[in-house]
Swiss-Prot record:
InterPro entries: ATPase_NBD, Hexokinase, Hexokinase_BS, Hexokinase_C, Hexokinase_N. Belongs to the hexokinase family. It catalyses: a D-hexose + ATP = a D-hexose 6-phosphate + ADP + H(+); D-mannose + ATP = D-mannose 6-phosphate + ADP + H(+); D-fructose + ATP = D-fructose 6-phosphate + ADP + H(+); D-glucose + ATP = D-glucose 6-phosphate + ADP + H(+). Its EC number is 2.7.1.1. The keyword Transferase applies. Substrate binds at residues 144-145, 161-162, 196-197, 225, 252, 283. Keywords: ATP-binding, Glycolysis, Kinase, Nucleotide-binding, Transferase. Monomer. This is Hexokinase-2. It comes from Schizosaccharomyces pombe (strain 972 / ATCC 24843) (Fission yeast). Residues 3-445 form the Hexokinase domain. ATP binds at residues 68-73, 222, 288-289, 325-329, 400-404. Pathway: Carbohydrate metabolism; hexose metabolism; Carbohydrate degradation; glycolysis; D-glyceraldehyde 3-phosphate and glycerone phosphate from D-glucose: step 1/4.
Length: 455
């Protein structure tokens, strides 16, 4: 029976393998999708303009609120930009309640967000209540969901991702809902900029890094997405609508589905059971929200078909989303039977041998490795197709996978070398810590400057 189990795991590992040639095809396909998205709206890659035309230099100063609405948490921040790439920050963080983020009505989540902002203002800026509008606190709002952005302050939600489902908000300006929530509480706040977290990561990396050639910002967290700097003359859909030589573009690449990359049985089962089945396929291969669930479904299959754990299903394994990606992160610290047993001890598995434990490590590793290899595709595609080949280039990244998943960036770089050869050495990849907060403040500063004619 153990021999059959070993063969089953080997097949699973093979199913999650993407060879170099498949990745090269994906690089070409990604660029074709990018070009279509720059031509017109409504394409697979949204290629949404951020209405930010320049990157910060590191010299920027100012005090701003930032509100970060991500896939798991809500953060309210007060940020002081000190210049020289430095900043100070105060913040509070709250977990998004399930009853608010899966609700027909938008009111519960707006009430939740507005109430937390009110508590933050009462704690840190009580004297601001009742001040004239010209003294309101400027805020940058990070809204990390696919949206049609029509100005620096207007962003219309296209669809929910990361497990959220609030139908009333679809095709609506979410920031306007927030503004109404603030007004109902007489909060002294003015939203100056609405950005995506990838744009925040990009501008934060440009602000804090000593590198002068930052061109991408990428999120590898609950979901995945990227932003980059594009030349205005390469964006036909903005012809005559914007000034300046460049535009920051939020790509919304989580929606990509490469025809050249196959889906495993576990991918198909996972996708079927998500609120947005058939969509965000790339994100469901790479996002931290999904890797643990893919592993859980693999374990379920091994128990059911190959009698792993004596065919017994621990209650924690039968529930969807019960195995988080942090479990895989802990497993990847060391390939040893002892480590696997310790990490999976809460699931009460009965291992027949140390080898069986190592087989599970191999299965988990294959899922994470595929995610890292797929993550190299957009980087390689943009590097090759935007005139940067042969040049030093800097990429800012943020999110739980690059921070906490062992060797994720190493595996990404391995695939990058396969795709662009020695050029991989010219690409620096660095953490843009607090990109969603600092980036929102930087974009709010840019918006205020433009409003005053100072940009």
């Amino acid at each position: 029976m153990e021999a059959n189990f070993q063969q089953a795991v080997k097949k699973l590992v093979n199913d999650f393998e993407y060879p170099t040639e498949s990745l090269r095809e994906a690089v070409k396909e990604f660029d074709e999708l990018r070009q279509k998205g720059l031509q017109k709206n409504g394409e697979v890659l949204a290629m949404a303009p951020a209405f930010i035309s320049t990157l910060p230099t590191g010299a920027e100063t100012g005090d701003f609120l930032a509100l970060d609405f991500g896939g798991t948490n809500l953060r309210v921040c007060w940020i002081q930009l000190l210049g020289d790439g430095k900043y100070e920050m105060k913040h509070s963080k709250s977990v998004l309640p399930r009853e608010c983020v899966r609700n027909e009505s938008v009111k519960p989540i707006i009430d939740f967000m507005s109430d937390h902002v009110e508590l933050f203002i009462k704690e840190h800026f009580p004297s601001k209540f009742g001040c004239p509008e010209e003294e309101y606190l400027p805020m940058g709002f990070t809204f990390s969901y696919p949206a049609n952005q029509v100005s620096i302050t207007e962003s219309y939600l296209l669809r929910w991702t990361k497990g959220l489902n609030i139908p009333e908000a679809i095709n609506k300006d979410f920031a306007q809902f927030l503004t109404e929530g603030f007004k109902a509480r007489n909060l002294p706040i003015r939203i100056e900029a609405v950005i995506n977290d990838t744009v925040g990561t990009l501008v934060t990396r440009a602000y804090t890094s000593k590198e002068s050639d930052t061109f991408m910002g990428i999120i590898f967290g609950t979901g995945t997405n990227g932003a980059y700097v594009e030349q205005m003359n390469q964006i036909p859909k903005l012809a005559g609508k914007c000034t300046g030589d460049h535009m920051l573009i939020n790509m919304e690449w989580g929606a990509t589905d490469f025809s050249c990359l196959h889906s495993t049985r576990y991918d198909l089962l996972l996708d079927h059971d998500t609120p947005n089945a058939g969509r965000q396929i790339f994100e469901k291969r790479v996002g931290g929200m999904y890797l643990g669930e893919l592993f859980r479904r693999a374990l379920f299959h091994l128990i059911k078909v190959y009698n792993f754990n004596e065919g017994i299903f621990p209650p924690s394994i039968t529930d969807a989303w019960s195995l988080e990606t942090s479990v895989l992160s802990r497993m990847m610290v060391e390939r040893s039977a002892e480590n696997v047993r310790n990490v999976l001890s809460t699931f009460k598995f009965r291992f027949r041998s140390d080898e069986e434990a190592l087989y599970l490590w191999d299965a988990a590793h294959a899922i994470g490795r595929r995610a890292a290899r797929m993550s190299a595709v957009p980087i390689a595609s943009l590097y090759l197709s935007t005139g940067r080949a042969g040049k030093k280039s800097d990429v800012g990244v943020d999110g739980s996978l690059v921070e906490h998943y062992p060797h994720f960036v190493d595996m990404l770089r391995e695939a990058l070398r396969e795709l662009i050869g020695d050029n991989e050495k010219l690409i620096s990849i660095g953490i843009a810590k607090d990109g969603s907060g600092i980036g929102a403040a930087l974009c709010a500063l840019q918006a205020v400057k433009e409003k005053k004619g100072l940009a």
